[in-house]
């Protein structure tokens, strides 16, 4: 997404969000600003945090995911989960203020795409603020472990160019005060700790007695429909796709939307549902914060300014579909 770019200042907050309430109301929908805390599939009702209960004939869930933070880490004075995205904007302001006082030690935990982009864009933030910081990426087993060696090599070169220290084979085990301890026993200074260790759906579905996958996501069939409750559907990060595991990337959520729309309408009238067929190849572009990106498209891997220009164009074009 565009979150790391907002952290660095490449994108403004208003450029990476759209007004869901306005969109819903303008199309004749009701908008309720509240949190669903439990689903009652027997009564076909949603229980909201504010106490209200909302009945449904069909329901679609896109409740997203969050970053699980161990209690031994959450005690740190300045831990920043990379989701929800508002956390990044708050961290940006706090880092800019802190840089006026001293050189910072910033640690990013997580060697996936999010960790890579956060670490790289932190360097841009520090540079533009005319400050100084030691930035360390603790990548777990290895950086971008599930990717081709060509992608990893370009990412590693990019981090070296940005003077980001990469540590592999270790994880952040504990954090307190102004330091973190790694699984190797090593302790490192840390003023800000960004947690990018993967995402996990909320416990909503398990708490409601609805079948869920190993990570707690709503277990759905190829129609994006609950395997036990045919009136319940879902998409994005909050589902577990029974036919095969799906990476938690935005392209799947975007492609699931028209399928969900069709199937919700068809379910209301007893029509035949249409399957979601996930693509196996999709464009991946990692924003390196310096106007370049590492790009993978099928077997093609490249990096540079053209890569970032492509990513930026696609991201902004998508957002403008809903902002206009």
Positions of PLM-derived features:
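Rossmann-like NAD(P)H-binding beta-loop-alpha module
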Residues: 92-132, 138
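C-terminal auxiliary extensions adjacent to catalytic cores
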Residues: 290-324
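A Rossmann-like FAD-binding core segment of flavoenzymes
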Residues: 31-39, 124-222
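N-terminal Rossmann-like dinucleotide/flavin-binding domain of flavoprotein oxidoreductases
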Residues: 1-58, 148-165
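FAD-site-proximal beta/loop scaffold in flavoenzymes
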Residues: 77-102, 187-255, 262-263
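FAD-binding core/adjacent interface of flavoenzyme oxidoreductases
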Residues: 26-107, 194
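Internal hydrophobic alpha-helix adjacent to the cofactor/substrate pocket in enzyme cavities
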Residues: 127, 251-279
């Amino acid at each position: 997404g565009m979150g790391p770019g907002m952290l660095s200042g490449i994108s403004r907050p208003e450029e990476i969000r759209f007004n869901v309430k306005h969109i819903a109301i303008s199309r004749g929908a009701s908008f309720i600003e509240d949190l669903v805390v439990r689903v009652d599939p027997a009564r076909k009702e949603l229980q909201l945090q504010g106490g209200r209960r909302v009945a449904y004939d069909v329901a679609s869930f896109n409740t997203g995911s969050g970053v699980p933070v161990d209690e031994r880490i959450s005690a740190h004075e300045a831990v920043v989960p990379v989701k929800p995205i508002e956390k990044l904007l708050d961290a940006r302001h706090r880092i800019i203020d802190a840089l006026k006082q001293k050189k910072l030690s910033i640690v990013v935990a997580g060697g996936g795409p999010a960790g890579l982009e956060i670490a790289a864009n932190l360097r841009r933030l520090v540079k533009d603020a005319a400050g100084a910081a030691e930035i360390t990426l603790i990548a777990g087993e290895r950086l971008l472990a599930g990717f081709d060696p060509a992608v990893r090599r370009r990412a590693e070169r990019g981090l070296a160019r940005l003077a980001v220290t990469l540590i592999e084979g270790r994880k952040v085990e504990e954090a307190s005060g102004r330091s973190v301890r790694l699984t190797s026993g090593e302790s490192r200074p840390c003023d800000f700790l960004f947690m990018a260790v993967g995402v996990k759906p909320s416990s909503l579905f398990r708490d409601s007695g609805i079948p869920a996958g190993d990570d707690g996501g709503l277990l759905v069939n190829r129609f994006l429909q609950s395997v036990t409750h045919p009136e319940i559907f879902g998409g994005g990060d909050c589902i577990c796709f029974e036919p095969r595991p799906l990476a938690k990337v935005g392209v799947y959520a975007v492609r699931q939307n028209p399928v969900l729309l069709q199937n919700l309408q068809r379910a209301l009238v007893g029509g035949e549902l249409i399957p979601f067929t996930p693509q196996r190849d999709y464009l991946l572009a990692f924003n390196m914060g310096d106007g370049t990106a590492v790009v993978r498209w099928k077997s093609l891997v490249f990096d540079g300014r053209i890569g970032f220009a492509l990513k930026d164009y696609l991201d902004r074009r998508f957002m403008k579909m809903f902002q206009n």
